[in-house]
């Protein structure tokens, strides 16, 4: 059996886009996450929390969005999700899937 070496392990430590996985683990946000976050901040200016996570390994195919905003007050969950979908209408065309979690800030 051959001894372990960093060079031999390098192919195993590469993510979907060829970036080392440890870069993704310690990076703050991907370009796609930043873009989606910025759009949501513009569309929901009263949001108290927005978290966008690329759950497709960094390739931008699937995102999880958690957003807390007063704009959702007195709206059913399906209406809240429709608002998020409408805000991201153009970006969704390039995605495989989207998980949305919405809430109203607690007082």
Swiss-Prot record:
Biological processes annotated in GO: adaptive thermogenesis; cell redox homeostasis; energy homeostasis; glucose metabolic process; intracellular iron ion homeostasis; iron-sulfur cluster assembly; response to lipoic acid
Keyword Nucleotide-binding listed: no
Tissue and organ expression note: Widely expressed.
Key words of the record: Disease variant, Mitochondrion, Primary mitochondrial disease
First-listed, main subcellular location of the protein, grouped into a coarse class: mitochondrion
Entry superkingdom: Eukaryota
Compartmental location: Mitochondrion
Alphabetical list of InterPro entries matching this protein: BolA (IPR002634), BolA-like_sf (IPR036065), Mt_Fe-S_assembly_factor (IPR052275)
Record family assignment: Belongs to the BolA/IbaG family.
Function: Acts as a mitochondrial iron-sulfur (Fe-S) cluster assembly factor that facilitates (Fe-S) cluster insertion into a subset of mitochondrial proteins. Probably acts together with NFU1.
Protein name: BolA-like protein 3
Organism of provenance: Homo sapiens
